[in-house]
Each structure stands twice: as structure tokens, then as C-alpha cells.
């Protein structure tokens, strides 16, 4: 009788691990799945942050360089141009990255998204995307600055006028030589197409421009005429007219 009870006890006690094994296994699998999901989410966040930083850094550097070069040739100035370019380049690069990420997560084909992302990266590194964004931003800054100078010039000396000369009269402005853009005078020494440093637009064949005396810098008539009515110097080299 005792032997029977002992056997029954051993059987019952041995049955508990058998009944609890499936529950324990499911619990372990859930823990593994949760850990796998957590690790994937963390890695995805880290990779996204690294790529965002990369795009922002490249955009900032290229934007600052492009903005500085444009600002040096306009009224924005080297430092202000670099600052505007850096901010615009960083913001635009992050926008491009986020758009690429949204496209990657969409229902579009993975291969097409991959080619698009490669094209974006190449265009970003070459500076094309940043230049396309910086140009309008710098033009807006130049126009805003010229408008501000126009309203304050009667009471204050322009911060950008190092020559100290006042604006010319309308009659004097009209006496400054005009010329028509042709294939012979539309390029600089580096064979690049000349452009107006006020509005940043390239000169087109057949356009009438004004060539300043002494320095011979050329500008669109509306751009330079408005400038000369407020300043008596070249907006590029500051040489007095």
C-alpha cells in the first residue's frame, strides 16, 4: 500500500513539469520576441539618427560654402551668406532625407526606392541639390536687405557702403554706358556665363545691361539703377562711380 502511494506521489509530482513546460516555453519565446523588437527599434533609431546627422552635416558644409561664395558677390556679405547657406542647406538636406525615408517605407518597389536614394546622395554630395536651394534663399536675403537699406538710407549711413558716397541723380545714372549682351561679352575669364550680382540671374543674349565705368562690372538696368540712386559706388567692388 505504501509502495502504491509512493508511486502515485512520484507520478503526480513528475507531472507538474510536463504541464508547465509549454507555458514556460511560450513565456521565453515572448521574451525573445520582445527583445528582438526592442533591439530592432533601437538599431533603427540609431541608424536613422546617424543618417540624419550625415545629411545635415553635408548640407550644412555645402550650404555654407555655396552661401559664402554667393554672399561674397552680392550685398549679403561673406559671413551672412555662409550663415544663410548653412541653415538652408541643413534644413533642405533633412527634408530630402525624410522624404526619402517616407518613400522607402511606402508601397513602392524596394529597388526603385534604392535607386532614388542613391541619386539623392550623389546629388547631395555633388552640391547640386544644395545649390538649387541656396540660390533662391540668397536672392530673397539680398532683396530683403536692399529693401531695408532703401527705407533707412535717408536717416542712416548704409552699413555696407564703405566708400561713403551718396546716390547719383537720375540724369547721371542714365549717362552710364549701356551695352547689349552678345556671344562675345557673355562670359568671364573662366568661360563661365556672366550674371548680375544683384539678382543672381544669368545675362541672356540680346539683353541690355549697364556697364559701370572704371571697373566695367555689368548689371541688369533695373537692378543697378535702383542701387545707384541710393549709392554712388559699384555694389561688387565698392569703387566710386
From Swiss-Prot:
MF (Gene Ontology): zinc ion binding
Residue numbers on the Lumenal, thylakoid membrane side: 1-36, 98-109
Alphabetized InterPro entries for the sequence: Gly-zipper_YMGG (IPR027367), Znf_RING (IPR001841), Znf_RING/FYVE/PHD (IPR013083)
Disordered: region residues: 1-20
This protein's UniProt keywords: Chloroplast, Membrane, Metal-binding, Plastid, Thylakoid, Transmembrane, Transmembrane helix, Zinc, Zinc-finger
Transmembrane regions: 37-57, 77-97, 110-130
PROSITE patterns reported for this sequence: ZF_RING_2
Family named by the database record: Belongs to the RING-type zinc finger family. NIP subfamily.
Protein name, UniProt field: NEP1-interacting protein 2
Natural source organism: Arabidopsis thaliana
Lineage summary: Eukaryota, Viridiplantae, Streptophyta, Embryophyta, Tracheophyta
